[in-house]
């Protein structure tokens, strides 16, 4: 197959591993900085230009699009879909997953377990907002935050009020969630490919840190999932329309709860922790689902 990896940095671990896995299986692979592409969107024969050359006849696309590049990145993915390329994640699913509020609303509608969550912008009834999720302690998040940035644990009602007031001064949209104390600062990253969890790890926050992000000094270990946890991760990815996803779960007293779904999950932490060839699993999935030579429009509006 002819595969395009859409990535701004070919030296990133995830990009390198995907390229290596594809080449090991004898595919023709090209890493493309999607931010440097331009497109003809009105042509009867739509195309993408990169480094002065038309990008044509790709059987499969692997988007590795960071949060800050979502708008243009998904536009490029959409153009490849119009040209008939099979994307590991569709442009629509990526856009949907990048909106944290919309993601939670979709998951709630599908009956998937979530922490009790409130959403606000400039409410004057801060006390009511806090009580809506069961009172302190609560976790307060900036809607646009990533990698644990803009996430605060408020252990008392007064602390929660102070944080919400401060965020309100930033003219920010905020999520307020119940704090799952029994999780003890750990979460579980489930890596879903297709309709299967191919690898999973438990992440523990650094000393005195309730956020478990590896970017923030957390550590990771292999973990055995329960059937309910596997089912929840797969159902969550499917609800979002994601074929490749990192689903973050908390273990609560009333079952697994979904914290977040990532449409461009990193491979380094999960591969080094579990020893699973996750990049290879993604390429295998493309082999089974991307029909070489298919040129019909795959776009979903």
From Swiss-Prot:
In this chain, Mn(2+) 1 is annotated as bound at 248, 260
GO MF annotations for this entry?
ATP binding; metal ion binding; ribosomal S6-glutamic acid ligase activity
User: Which branch of life, at top level?
Assistant: Bacteria
Q: What is the designated name of this protein?
A: Probable alpha-L-glutamate ligase
> Which UniProt keywords are given for this protein, alphabetically ordered?
ATP-binding, Ligase, Magnesium, Manganese, Metal-binding, Nucleotide-binding, Protein biosynthesis
Q: Which Pfam families match?
A: RimK (PF08443), Rimk_N (PF18030)
Tell me the organism. Answer: Picosynechococcus sp. (strain ATCC 27264 / PCC 7002 / PR-6)
Provide the E.C. number(s) assigned to this enzyme. Answer: 6.3.2.-
Q: Which InterPro entries does the annotation name?
A: ATP-grasp, ATP-grasp_RimK-type, ATP_grasp_subdomain_1, RimK, Rimk_N, Rp_bS6_RimK/Lys_biosynth_LsyX
Transmembrane spans: none
Q: Which cofactor does it need?
A: Mg(2+); Mn(2+)
- Binding locations of ATP: 141, 178-179, 187, 211-213
The record's remark on the cofactor is:
Binds 2 magnesium or manganese ions per subunit.
Name the residues that bind Mg(2+) 2: 260, 262
Q: Binding of Mg(2+) 1: at which residues?
A: 248, 260
Query: Which biological process, per GO, is one annotated for this protein?
Result: protein modification process
GO CC terms of this entry: cytoplasm
Q: Which Gene3D superfamilies match?
A: 3.40.50.20, ATP-grasp fold, A domain, ATP-grasp fold, B domain
Which protein family is named in the record? Belongs to the RimK family.
**Residue ranges occupied by any ATP-grasp domain in the UniProt entry:** 104-287
Question: Which SUPFAM superfamilies does the record associate with it?
Answer: Glutathione synthetase ATP-binding domain-like
Name of the top EC class for this enzyme:
ligase
Keyword Disulfide bond attributed: no
| Disulphide bonds in the chain | none
């Amino acid at each position: 197959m002819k595969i395009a990896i859409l990535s701004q940095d070919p030296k990133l671990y995830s990009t390198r591993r995907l390229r290596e896995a594809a080449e090991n299986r004898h595919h023709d692979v090209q890493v493309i900085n999607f931010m440097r592409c331009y497109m003809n969107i009105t042509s009867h024969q739509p195309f993408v230009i990169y480094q002065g050359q038309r990008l044509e006849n790709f059987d499969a696309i692997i988007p590795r699009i960071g949060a800050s590049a979502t708008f243009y990145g998904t536009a490029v993915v959409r153009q490849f879909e119009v040209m008939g390329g099979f994307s590991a994640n569709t442009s629509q699913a990526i856009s949907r997953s990048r909106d944290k509020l919309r993601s939670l609303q979709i998951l709630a509608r599908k009956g998937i377990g979530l922490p009790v969550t409130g959403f606000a912008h400039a409410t004057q009834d801060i006390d009511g907002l806090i009580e809506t999720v069961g009172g302190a302690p609560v976790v307060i998040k900036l809607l646009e935050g990533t990698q644990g940035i803009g996430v605060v644990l408020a252990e008392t009602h007064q602390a929660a009020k102070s944080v919400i007031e401060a965020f309100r001064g930033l003219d920010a949209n905020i999520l307020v969630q119940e704090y799952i104390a029994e999780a003890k600062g750990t979460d579980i990253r489930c890596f879903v490919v297709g309709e299967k969890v191919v690898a999973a790890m438990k992440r523990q926050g650094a000393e005195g840190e309730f956020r478990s992000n590896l970017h923030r000094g957390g550590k990771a270990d292999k973990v055995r999932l329960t059937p309910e946890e596997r089912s929840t991760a797969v159902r969550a990815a499917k609800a979002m329309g994601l074929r490749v996803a990192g689903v973050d779960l908390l273990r609560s007293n009333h079952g697994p709860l979904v914290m977040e779904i990532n449409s461009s999950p990193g491979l380094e932490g999960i591969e080094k922790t579990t020893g699973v060839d996750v990049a290879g699993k993604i390429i295998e999935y493309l082999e089974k689902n991307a029909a070489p030579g298919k040129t019909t429009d795959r776009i979903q509006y």
